[in-house]
Every structure is written in structure tokens, then in C-alpha cells.
């Protein structure tokens, strides 16, 4: 099949497509030439996971969050490298990273209808597509995500969101990059829609859970 995972910590040759790698995305992106990926769809940590987006304390037990590895906001070097290896970018929670993103009018607002786990009832998604109008993705997030039995990541996005993004912003044949895979929703969407992809997840536990989620999903497709 197209999907494979790989626990990899280094190497010189360019990484293979259609794999999820358990490694630092900064090390991974270094192995690709300029503008190799037509589109990067990323959901970096905001650095605020010890609190909800509304300011309250999160439950310390619902999800495994290790601040030293997972919940660390990207540095300026990350954004420089992301823009180097990708032609266009979509950034979930882009309003947290405006210091690094150029201003434009092509934002997406993901309307969730009701808050989830004390999170806001919507999320801003930045895109680099200056030639496109702003859009709204209206999705009954709460019922849909809680009906999934495989939710294990604190900022897990529904596969439907990524499929909508790919349908509206990607072209057939595009190679897709996700630097912080988390729950693998992005990779499942790429797999289902026939896009080549590369994913990175630095956290070993999230990596293994994402691998298992992909494996089960693929079995269900056959």
C-alpha cells in the first residue's frame, strides 16, 4: 500500500513519500529541496496547552501533554524552513503566529457550533493564497469528533476539515507536508483523496497512536 510509517532519527538521503516519521520536523525539512511540497497544511502547538483557550485550567489527565516536547511553539527558524520547502501554506490557529505570517485576506474561519473541552467555538486558519476569498468551514465538530472512538490528541482535527482544505486548496498531483501530525487526520485525508504526503510527529506516543489509527483506517477501506 501507499502508507508506511518509519521510526527514524536521522539520515542524509531525502525521505520517502507517503510515510509518517517519528522525528523532529526541523531535521526532516532540511532533507528536502526548496519548494518541494506544493502545499503544507500544519497545526503547530500554540504553547498554551496548560490552559484552555478561554483561560481555564485543562484537565491534567485527559490527554498526555509533555510541555518539553509537544507543547512548544515553533521558532522563527521553523517558519523560515516551512516557507522554504513549501510553495503554499495553510496554518491552523494562524492568529497565534501572526508575527511570522504575512497579512492577507484569505483566512478561513472554522465554525464548530459549540465549544469542545472549553476551547473556543471557532478557529482561525491562515492561508498563503492571496488570490482566494476568505472562507468559512461550517462543521458540527462536537458531535462528530465525540463519536470517534480514536480521539487521543488535545487538538485533534476531524478528517472532514482536511478533506475540505484539500478540495479547496490543493490540486491533483500536489505533494502535502504536515510538520506536526498529531492524530493523523491530515494523512488519512491525503490517503483517501490520493495525495502524496510526508508527515512528522516528534512525540513517540502520539506517533504510535497515529500509526495505529492509520492502520485501522486502511483495513476498513479494503
Language-model features: locations:
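Class I S-adenosyl-L-methionine-dependent methyltransferase catalytic core
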Residues: 1-177, 183-222
Amino acid at each position: 500500500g501507499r502508507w508506511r510509517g518509519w521510526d527514524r532519527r536521522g539520515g542524509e538521503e531525502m525521505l520517502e513519500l507517503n510515510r509518517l516519521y517519528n522525528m523532529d520536523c526541523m531535521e526532516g525539512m532540511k532533507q528536502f529541496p526548496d519548494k518541494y511540497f506544493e502545499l503544507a497544511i500544519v497545526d503547530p502547538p500554540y504553547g498554551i496547552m496548560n490552559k484552555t483557550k478561554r483561560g481555564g485550567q485543562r484537565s491534567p489527565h485527559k490527554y498526555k501533554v509533555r510541555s518539553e516536547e509537544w507543547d512548544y511553539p515553533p521558532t522563527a527558524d521553523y517558519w523560515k524552513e516551512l516557507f522554504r520547502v513549501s510553495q503554499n501554506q495553510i496554518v491552523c490557529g494562524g492568529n497565534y503566529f501572526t508575527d511570522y505570517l504575512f497579512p492577507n485576506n484569505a483566512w478561513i474561519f472554522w465554525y464548530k457550533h459549540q465549544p469542545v473541552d472549553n476551547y473556543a467555538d471557532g478557529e482561525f486558519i491562515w492561508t498563503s493564497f492571496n488570490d482566494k476569498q476568505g472562507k468559512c468551514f461550517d462543521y458540527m465538530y462536537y458531535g462528530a469528533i465525540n463519536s470517534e472512538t480514536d480521539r487521543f490528541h488535545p487538538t485533534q482535527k476531524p478528517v472532514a476539515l482536511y478533506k475540505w482544505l484539500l478540495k479547496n486548496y490543493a490540486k491533483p498531483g500536489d505533494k502535502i507536508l504536515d510538520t506536526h501530525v498529531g492524530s493523523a487526520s491530515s494523512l488519512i485525508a491525503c490517503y483517501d483523496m490520493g495525495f502524496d504526503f510526508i508527515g512528522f510527529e516528534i512525540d513517540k506516543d502520539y506517533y504510535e497512536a497515529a500509526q495505529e489509527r492509520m492502520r485501522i483506517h486502511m483495513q476498513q477501506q479494503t
